[in-house]
């Protein structure tokens, strides 16, 4: 199937500091493209992959699972590590969960983690019944475009494929057990009013990780897709400030320096 316009992956070759940006479940790179673009404009090397099964039609996602989504971000991380001296991982929603697993699995190869409204549990969708219901009903109503800003719209599926939702639930349960392995500096930004991932997920993540350098920011004016909402600029600036604080490869003037 052809890609939906706007769902294309994004790559920018900048300096020696790399950033991997991960989009969310049933979404597309469009939801985090301004975030990635801001970091690219500041001179960083940025990779924003399209997750398998996304960006076309929801039926294509039925044929994929968490192993496919994680393999893609793991591959993208590997490419950044070959190109850059330092790499940060970022993500929205499920993308945040994928970023946290990359941090847990790759240790010092990941310099820091930035997550926005990260998922820790599948809520609703009859989550506990998914193992059975997914064989009876292929999909249910979508979760895209939870945005407070008038006119804000996320490019995502209008249906949630239940086989994929079941796989996502299994992934989050596994990740919860791995969160203590996350030791890197962490910037977690979340919306008090989120109709997809409730704030309790962020609280759980903060309680489970082993990171000592932790910064929490509230996104008071935004819903779930905060990267397209009123607090988008705050997210972009906080992310760059976090990376600048931790990386010797980012110059004071804002441009990422190259060796």
Across the structure, where does each feature detected by a protein language model lie?
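Catalytic nucleophile-loop/oxyanion-hole region of alpha/beta-hydrolase
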Residues: 57-84, 88
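Catalytic histidine neighborhood in serine/cysteine hydrolases
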Residues: 47, 203, 207-225
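Active-site nucleophile loop of the alpha/beta-hydrolase fold
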Residues: 114-124
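Short alpha-helix in the alpha/beta-hydrolase fold that links the catalytic acid
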Residues: 35, 184, 198-207
